[in-house]
């Protein structure tokens, strides 16, 4: 039951369109992809692109649908929730990573970079994986070791060679580019102020591992990129990877902000990550809604001792409490979206992520209990 939701017109339109796509395309394929650890079907990516789901945060002047303001954030939240109701692995997470890069570009990209990349992000011509976490540095982003050092390209162009290892790079096999945070200042005492953000093009790779090479210089030196898949219990379909880069060259024009972006990568990245926390909460609401619907349906169709499971008071209490948490999480997310539209809500975005994800654990467990181990 979704009574009491407070959305605006733009969000309602997004909800109706995405809900139809979720029910017709995503939900029927979700279990098969999860059980067999297959790839996200291309028809899902192309379908979401056709309806404009990847352009919700891309400014209209660059081929997207964003006019700024509250509607943009609300539309993203309701779309993310609805896609996650169908599948977390092949639905809800797909639009998050392009949106993170979009916000980083809007924040710090040059006009040429915006013209080059934002239209491609809006249409899914370019799909993105985020390469920030490293084996020894997760939340401690300021300590990362992957380096980007100035180096000329095969035709003498200015650029950088990237060396090091990134991990938990979701969707990195299928992605066309990595949004990669690297250390451009060797003075580690500068911590996060020595980091810069790059758009790193790559070929599309196999879901179960990939290895690419590139000729970097006239001396025949070769750049290498190798992706090792990390098996996961959930989030199947997008696949996560550990990526090793050795002398992988990128042009200087792919440094977000170009020369003026040196040392500002952490701030550009956080512009995307803050809204990513809100989207994580929205995904959790979608998972809760799916769990509730499955439990509700089962309880009303399963007969035990002559009665439907739903007729027993304990089941009714469980369903009632689940509904309370779902609606609380949903409305919390809406309010944070409104704050973020005003340039506020950084702390609240972390709060809603922490609260709703914890609630989703409980709701999913209660749904399993109602199923009685079925």
Regions found by a protein language model. Give the residues of each.
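Alpha-helical interface subdomain recognition
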Residues: 1-85, 96, 108-109, 113, ...
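A short, Trp-centered hydrophobic/proline-enriched beta-strand micro-motif
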Residues: 124-132
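Active-site-adjacent elements of ketosynthase-type condensing enzymes
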Residues: 136-145, 210-215
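Short Gly/Pro-enriched turn/cap motifs at secondary-structure boundaries
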Residues: 136-139, 168-171, 188-189, 231-239
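A structural signal for short hydrophobic beta-strand segments in well-ordered beta-sheet cores
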Residues: 146-150
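A short core secondary-structure module
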Residues: 158-159, 163-223
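Flexible, small-/acidic-enriched active-site or ligand-binding loops
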Residues: 206-248
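Long, acidic (Asp/Glu-rich), low-complexity accessory segments flanking structured domains
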Residues: 246-267
